[in-house]
Amino acid sequence: MSTGLNAGMRLTGNRSRSIEDVPTIVGIDHGFSFPLRYFEVHQLAPDWPTFLEDFQRHWPADAEHTYVDFIRDGAAGNGAARTGNARWRRVTEQRSGSAKSVFHFDVPGSVVKSTHAGIPWLLYLRRQFGARLHFWPFDGWSIPAGMSAVVEVYPSLWKHRFPSHDRTPDQHDAFSVASWLREADRSGQLARFLKPSLTPAERAVAGVEGWILGVA
């Protein structure tokens, strides 16, 4: 499955192709950053690359045999020095209407564990691919022609639009994301969702907190 985008990207389901072979848009279902309040409390510069480095040092979930719960329990890393409050929500989570806080541990439907586990791997990808991979919207709201991109997605926005058939919930989430991206591409709506209607102040905050693709 592949579709051509106006920006020169393609959505592909062929796993034998790398993002360098075919420009690809990759949707990942977890938070890419934290609310601005987190940066303020921990006295961090509002800068996403700096955040990635700092977070990985405290929550090294990319290390071998290291899990989020190990870090929470103090057996690895120093997660206690980089925690947040479940009441803190990013602008995009507030705008979505239903997305939970990236600090809301131990509740159904939360992506907090996958967020804490996944952010160090975003740093890994950034180190591996450098400028060859666009992290939206941190590297800019416009994705350069011919470049692959990684975006944050929230399957709950779209999964009810597609019959689940015999898929597991996780399989249906992945199917729904891929199907929506394909439809949005073919209809010309994807370009609009890559540039949501935000005030200058909201856009500046989202450049630090990140944004869920598809949230208007």
Segments the model singles out, each with a brief description of its role:
Residues M1-A216:
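RNase H-like (RuvC/DEDD) metal-dependent nuclease/polynucleotide-processing core
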